[in-house]
């Protein structure tokens, strides 16, 4: 228990970065997908060869 307490004091859980699915990051990914020249604005998708985060492959 002592070791756990020391570890939590030295490295609080808030210091651990969260996963990449945060709302602000999702919006940034969607914006970058829209600006990509391979983006199809009608289908809201891009070809599977040029897929980036926030962009759905056109199938």
Swiss-Prot record:
It is found in: Secreted. The keyword Disulfide bond applies. Expressed by the venom duct. Disulfide bonds join 45-59, 46-55, 51-58. One of its GO terms (molecular function) is toxin activity. Its main location: secreted. Residues 1-15 form the signal peptide. Residues 16-44 form a propeptide. The cysteine framework is III (CC-C-C-CC). Belongs to the conotoxin M superfamily. This is Conotoxin reg3.15. It comes from Conus regius (Crown cone).
